[in-house]
Amino acid sequence: NAVPQTPTAKTDAKNAIDQAATDKKNAIENDPALTRQEKDAAKAKVDEEAKKAKDAIDAATTNEDVTAKQTEGTQAINAVPQTPTAKTDAKNAVDQAATDKKNAIENDPALTRQEKDAAKAKVDDEAKKAKDAIDAATTNEDVTAQKDAGKDAINAVPQTPTAKTDAKNAVDQAATDKKNAIENDAALTRQEKDAAKAKVDEEAKKAKDAIDAATTNEDVTAKQTEGTQAINAVPQTPT
């Protein structure tokens, strides 16, 4: 009977390497932080490490060498990095865009404190949406597209001083209503109507100047209320 010549040590070691490579590639494939390109690159690196390990096993001359090369190969396979650089870089770019936009908002003198805070909160909201979209992207191209879309959305957050504009519009409307009432007051002479309407315009200007100088929504509202009251208090007295 022939003595069997079965290289079980090397075969078992290479099978173990193949299993380690399969397990690592499965982990890479199922890593949601990696893009398609990052997964493919990492799995190619695993295949490279597996080949090196099996070549080293084939070159080994003792069971101890085989075991050592199997161990080294398994460690090298498991050490292949799963680093989501594309998504990390994209999210860092979104964070920088958000920081720049919030600085611009904070330094805008036309905005009230509340408008600044609301605009900055909107920036944070757009940044979060962008980063969530980046996390959900599956390719480098998707990541770049979501990064660019997020930066555009952040930069598009309006810096519109609506509180002051609305307050001044309300003062203008109060002035218009008051002047209409004066004009339609049959008890007043032409000169009395003109004098009263000039006083209304004066009060409206004072109110709008005060609104422009306000720094908070509360200040704006207070100046609007004071101005409207002053306009409505202009007398319609037929002397």
How would you name each of these model-derived features?
Residues 1-239:
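Thr-biased low-complexity repeat/linker tracts and other Thr-enriched repetitive architectures
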